[in-house]
A protein has these predicted regions:
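Generic secondary-structure signature for well-ordered alpha-helical cores
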Residues: 7, 18-25, 49, 75, ...
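Short low-complexity stretches enriched in small and charged residues
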Residues: 2-3, 37-39, 68, 99, ...
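Canonical Radical SAM [4Fe-4S] cluster-binding loop centered on the CxxxCxxC motif
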Residues: 29-65
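Short hydrophobic/aromatic-rich motifs at helix boundaries and adjacent loops
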Residues: 41-43, 70-74
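Short charge-dense sequence patches
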Residues: 14-25, 47-56, 118-122
Length: 135
């Protein structure tokens, strides 16, 4: 069985590589990760920035600090930025929208991904206001 499993595994790997090559080619995508806040309203036990972790040194980057990060990343060749943080109530939908617009204004050819925990549908739709277009 082990020998057969190995044969099946090799065949599965071969087919998976063919599909990967057809769909994605031989490229690597690099994203600039900006961890702009480690405040979080949640208390997920596994998470280092959970609310009850009194050893975490809390921070929030200013808009200017975040924009400096994107400027530096852009100079280094990054064209996708991930804004990542805890579920920080200080960063309202309005603040996030302003931040995304500021980044888009400085770097219109860049993609922006948000990793901010759970948000409601209105948050992602900009409360009826269109978000800046992605390239």
């Amino acid at each position: 069985l082990i020998q057969k499993q190995s044969e099946y595994q090799k065949e599965a790997e071969k087919r998976a590589n063919i599909l990967r090559e057809q769909n994605f080619g031989n490229r690597i995508y690099v994203r600039g990760l900006i961890e702009f806040t480690n405040y979080c309203k949640n208390d997920c036990y596994y998470c280092g920035i959970r609310k009850s972790n009194q050893n975490a040194e809390r921070y929030r980057l200013s808009t200017e600090q975040i924009l400096e990060c994107t400027d530096t990343g852009y100079e280094l060749g990054f064209r996708t930025f991930v804004l990542q943080g805890g579920e920080d109530a200080w960063y309202t939908d309005e603040r996030i929208l302003e931040l995304v617009c500021a980044i888009r204004e400085r770097h219109p050819d860049c993609a922006i991904t948000l990793s901010l925990g759970e948000r409601n549908r209105d948050s992602y739709e900009g409360r009826g206001r269109p978000l800046p277009a992605s390239p």
